[in-house]
Amino acid sequence: MEENQFERTALLLGKASVERLARKRVAVFGVGGVGGFVCEGLVRAGIGAIDIVDKDIVALSNINRQLIALYSTVGKNKVDVLEERLKDINKNLIIKKYKCFFLPETSDTFDFREYDYVVDAIDTVTGKIELILKAKEAGVPIISAMGAGNKLDPTAFQVSDIYKTSVCPLARVMRRELKKRGVEKLKVVYSKEEPIKPQFEEGEEVVPGSVSFVPPALGLIIAGEIVKDLIRVE
């Protein structure tokens, strides 16, 4: 019998579901610590087409948590590195990459009606809000990542509606901004862990702390939610 790379997945999901995933197209906005692992989980599960969106360059400080960050990839475009990796996982994958940050001024680049699912793994509130509004306007399912920085407990993540979240500072801001814009619901993954205060030396740049095992957990939870949603028979 010919070997199939998705045969173990088919044992769990069923052959029809694996075939269904191969016909789906997902767009992942932001491919850093969270988004990179979303892509990894989706492609290894058998998603047939993926769009990846990010303007960032791999930096040395990314190595502690980002899938695509290695000494050999520092200085390269994240979407270029990720494209090569994902094509090496599934040679039949259809992949489209965009070297831009998603913001109101770049949003017209994308036709959201082409997507079966959208992932918000963006860092900025402005970008997140714009992406959510565009996906909602197009009637496309979207799942949004809340804060993964300043956290140590990968088991504290929960899948919820944005208006049922608590603790997470980013979720609090998003609730307020989405309510202003009339967004009634949004599927998110957020942490119930109280944020840890980073330990800065005087004069250091103020950025969130991060660790190797938290952003990947968030990304893989999101990938799992998407796969489960997409294989449900309509």
Question: What label would you give each PLM region?
Answer:
Residues 47, 52-89:
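Glycine-rich phosphate-binding loop and adjoining beta1-alpha1-beta2 segment
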Residues 2, 110-117, 122-127, 137, ...:
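Glycine-rich phosphate/adenylate-binding loop
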Residues 34-35:
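Hydrophobic/small residue at the entry helix of a nucleotide-binding pocket
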Residues 28-30, 53:
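Conserved N-terminal Rossmann-fold NAD(P)-binding element of oxidoreductases
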Residues 99-107:
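Conserved SAM/SAH-binding loop
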Residues 1-26:
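N-terminal charged helix/coil linker that caps or initiates catalytic domains
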Residues 43-49, 137-139:
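Conserved S-adenosyl-L-methionine
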